[in-house]
Amino acid sequence: MSRKTLPEKVYLSERIIDEEVAVCTVAAEVLAIFTLVCTRVFIIFFTARICHGIWPSSPSERPYHTFRAARLRNSSKMVSSNCVLSECGQFKRLTANLSQTVSPSHFLNLIKAPLLIAQRCCECASGNGC
């Protein structure tokens, strides 16, 4: 080997290492920005859910809230569709049971309209006028 080729090889290997470091630095910066954006979106999304009352404020109710809300919606649909065939006393008992399942504010927000329809239906079925 001559003396002239040795420094060129060293220079070439240093340049390759510098390029790899630059690529890794850019990749790390992109990953850091992506992580920061995802974290902020996550925080904003769940803060909005809690602040808008989609989840109850009590931590013990949170895992079951979605299931109970779906069950309440299905129950209220059942009441409104079968109300003509049922007695108003049965409707009132079901309403009382539903209101004990969740807190009053969530109860009103979830099934207020279907229950009002069912109540009106029961009034018609019992002859109180439509």
Curated annotation (Swiss-Prot):
Keyword annotations of the record: Membrane, Transmembrane, Transmembrane helix
Subcellular location: Membrane
Main location: membrane
Key word Transmembrane helix present: yes
Highest taxon of source: Eukaryota
GO cellular component, one term: membrane
Lipid bilayer topology: Single-pass membrane protein
Membrane-spanning intervals of the chain: 21-43
Misc remark: Partially overlaps SSN2.
Protein's name in the database: Putative uncharacterized protein YDR442W
Native source species: Saccharomyces cerevisiae (strain ATCC 204508 / S288c) (Baker's yeast)
